[in-house]
A protein has these predicted regions:
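A short, Lys/Arg-enriched amphipathic alpha-helix followed by its capping loop at the start of a domain
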Residues: 28-38, 218-223
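Conserved beta-strand positions in the Rossmann-like core of class I SAM-dependent methyltransferases
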Residues: 41, 229, 300
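Conserved catalytic-core segment of nucleotide-activated headgroup transferases in glycan assembly
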Residues: 182-265
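Carbohydrate-associated surface elements
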Residues: 160, 177-180
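Alpha-helix capping/helix-boundary segments
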Residues: 108-109, 160-162, 235, 299, ...
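Short amphipathic alpha-helix
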Residues: 22-33, 214-215, 364
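Extended catalytic core of nucleotide-activated donor transferases of GT-like folds
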Residues: 11-13, 19, 27-31, 41-165, ...
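Catalytic binding pocket for nucleotide-activated donors in carbohydrate/polymer assembly enzymes
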Residues: 25-28, 44-45, 241-246, 251-252, ...
Length: 373
């Protein structure tokens, strides 16, 4: 769309990425929209679960995380809301009266989304529901709490999710809208290699506990000569003890904007998707794939199938089928600098050519233009 638009985003949080990977992509996407000349405002609950836990759990690290966000994204206009207040509907009407496009992320309280949608007919904005989670597949009843019949369309972060909205929820207009890397923040850095293998990821409510055992913990036990580091949150005591037993260094919460430095200090990174993304939702890469490749680090993945041909498996990254193969690949890559270099270059090339937040911002504008016809 050639005209300059007023765009509103409602998300669980943009400020906090604590156990909240959605913030990664949304930050970069909103900045690219601003750079296209649009006016963007981001709304989030003042007491969001992610921000509350960030402040409660992380101490000084929380201050560092928020400060780094503010420095990295000065363009973003953040408005904190209190959706339980009686005057919230009036607040919404005043805020959205000149808005052209409203993006409603899936990890919002349904009552927030529904109150926004109740104003759509009166105010005339385009409303798009953005889903970058597996709930539509695993807990469909939770999605039905949203008044989806009022949206102009759904942005689904994978074709499998898009089909669920079309076939399962009866949404006529749905687009596959993958996440992508914010290449201004995620790019190769020059650092001395101090880590052999890094895994950046949260525990995931037992959605990949067996996979972490097979593809992270067991290889680390088999290769004690490697220095293996884990970043993430919500690891239960049993999991932490397993890391200790495998001589894996657990470092806890890592503000996402610090990830490029950790990748630069590491020889190889792992991608171990949650079970849903290697089974029923095969083909959907999570944000860590885009970010790791954008940082130019060789990536080795536990099983997942790139059904949408986003990448070049075997060239952009490696996929192993079991823990034994993971162990073999880690041993091989540790010794073969040429193989590491080629993997890193290939993955970085694919990201830059196809999977940046600028690519997705352009796609979003094309979708909005299609709706407006």
């Amino acid at each position: 769309m050639s005209q300059k638009l007023n765009i509103a985003l409602f998300a669980h949080s943009i400020v906090s990425d604590w156990n909240h990977g959605n913030a990664h992509f949304l930050r970069g996407l909103m900045r690219e929209l601003v750079r296209m000349g649009h006016t963007v405002r981001c709304y989030e609950e003042l007491s969001s679960w992610s921000l509350t836990n960030l402040m409660k759990q992380e101490g000084e690290r929380a201050i560092e995380a928020i400060d780094s966000f503010r420095r990295a994204y000065p363009e973003l206009d953040i408005c904190f809301c209190k959706s339980r207040d009686d005057d919230f509907p009036r607040f919404l009407e005043e805020e959205l009266k000149e808005t052209h496009i409203v993006l409603l992320h899936e990890w919002n309280d349904p009552q927030v989304v529904n109150k926004v949608l109740a104003l759509k007919k009166k105010l005339g904005f385009i409303a798009l529901f953005h889903d970058s989670h597996h709930r539509a597949h695993t807990r469909a009843g939770e999605i039905l709490k949203f008044h989806l019949h009022l949206v102009d369309g759904v942005l689904a972060f994978g074709e499998a999710i898009r089909r669920i909205y079309v076939d399962g929820f009866g949404i006529n207009r749905a687009w596959t809208f993958h996440e992508a890397a914010d290449v201004e923040q995620f790019h190769p850095l020059q650092r001395r290699k101090e880590i052999d293998v890094v895994w950046i990821g949260n525990w995931g409510d037992d959605e990949r506990s067996a996979e972490l055992d097979e593809f992270l913990i067991q290889p680390a036990q088999t290769l004690p000569e490697l220095r293996v580091v884990v970043h993430g949150v919500r690891y239960p005591d049993l999991a932490l003890q397993k890391l200790v037993n495998a001589n894996i260094e657990y470092r806890g919460y890592l503000p996402n904007l610090f990830s490029p430095q950790i990748y630069a200090e590491s020889v190889v990174s792992l991608h171990i998707p949650r079970r849903e993304y290697s089974n029923g939702l095969a083909g959907i890469p999570t944000i860590r794939v885009f970010e790791a490749l954008a940082c130019g680090i060789p990536l080795v993945c536990s099983p997942w199938v790139d059904q949408e041909n986003l990448f070049r498996p075997g060239e952009d990254y490696l996929v192993v089928q079991d823990g034994v193969e993971m162990t073999e690949q880690l041993r091989h890559l540790r010794r073969d600098g040429k193989a590491r270099y080629q993997l890193a270059e290939n993955g970085l090339q694919t990201i830059r050519e196809r999977h940046t937040c600028a690519h997705r911002a352009q796609q979003l504008m094309e979708i909005c233009q299609e709706i407006s016809r």
